[in-house]
C-alpha cells in the first residue's frame, strides 16, 4: 500500500459516508412525510427541506463526485432542520408527547451513528440540535434517559475512533518502515 492509495482510501471513505448520510436523511424524511408517526400533521416545512436538500445533494454528489461537500456544515444544517421538525410536530401533539420525542431522538441518533461511525464531530453536530430540542420539549421529564441515549453513541464512536487511530498509526508506521527498508535494500543493490 502506498501513500497515494492510502489517501484514495480516505477520500473514498469520505464519499461513502456522505452518500450514506444523505440517503438515510432522504429516506427517513420521506417516510416522515408519507407515513408520519403521529398524524396530527403530515407535512412540515423542515421535513420537506430535508427531502429536497438531501435529494439534490445526492444527485449533485453523484454527478460531480470529486467536488467536496463540507460534512460538518451539512450535518449541522440537517440537525437543525430535524430539530425544527421535532419541535413543530411536538407542539401540535397533546401532552405528554414523550413517546414521540424519544422515537424522534432515536431516529436521528440512528442516522448519525450509521453514517458517521468514524466522524464524532459530524455525529455530534447532526444529533445535538435534536437532542436539545427533545430535552426542552420534554420539560425535564426523562432527561436522564434521553441523555443516556445521546451519550451512548458518542462514547462508542469515540472509542472506535481511538482504536482506529491507533490502528492507522501502526499501519502507517509499518508502511514507512517497509518503504525505508526497501530504499535501503535498493541502495545496497546499487553498490
Segment roles from a protein language model:
Residues 77-78, 120-135, 150:
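Central hydrophobic cores of alpha-helical transmembrane segments
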Residues 1-10:
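Short, Lys/Arg-rich, polar N-terminal cytosolic tail immediately upstream
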Residues 149-182:
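Juxtamembrane or sensor-core-proximal signal-transducing alpha helices
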Residues 37-42, 95, 115-122, 137-145:
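Transmembrane helix interruption/hinge and helix-loop junction motifs
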Residues 108-120, 154-165:
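Short helix-perturbing small/polar motifs within transmembrane alpha-helices
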Residues 183-191:
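PAS/LOV and related PAS-like sensory modules
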Amino acid at each position: 500500500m502506498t501513500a497515494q492509495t492510502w489517501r484514495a482510501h480516505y477520500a473514498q471513505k469520505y464519499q461513502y459516508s456522505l452518500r450514506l448520510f444523505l440517503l438515510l436523511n432522504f429516506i427517513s424524511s420521506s417516510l416522515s412525510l408519507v407515513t408520519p408517526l403521529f398524524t396530527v400533521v403530515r407535512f412540515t416545512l423542515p421535513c420537506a427541506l430535508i427531502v429536497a436538500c438531501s435529494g439534490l445533494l445526492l444527485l449533485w454528489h453523484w454527478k460531480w463526485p470529486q467536488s467536496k461537500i463540507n460534512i460538518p456544515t451539512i450535518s449541522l444544517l440537517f440537525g437543525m432542520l430535524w430539530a425544527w421538525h421535532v419541535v413543530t410536530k411536538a407542539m401540535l401533539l397533546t401532552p405528554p408527547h414523550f413517546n414521540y420525542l424519544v422515537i424522534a431522538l432515536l431516529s436521528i441518533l440512528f442516522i448519525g451513528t450509521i453514517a458517521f461511525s468514524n466522524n464524532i464531530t459530524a455525529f455530534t453536530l447532526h444529533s445535538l440540535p435534536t437532542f436539545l430540542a427533545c430535552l426542552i420539549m420534554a420539560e425535564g421529564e426523562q432527561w436522564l434517559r434521553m441523555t443516556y441515549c445521546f451519550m451512548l453513541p458518542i462514547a462508542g464512536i469515540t472509542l472506535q475512533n481511538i482504536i482506529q487511530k491507533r490502528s492507522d498509526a501502526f499501519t502507517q508506521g509499518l508502511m514507512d518502515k517497509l518503504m525505508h527498508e526497501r530504499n535501503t535494500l535498493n541502495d545496497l543493490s546499487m553498490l
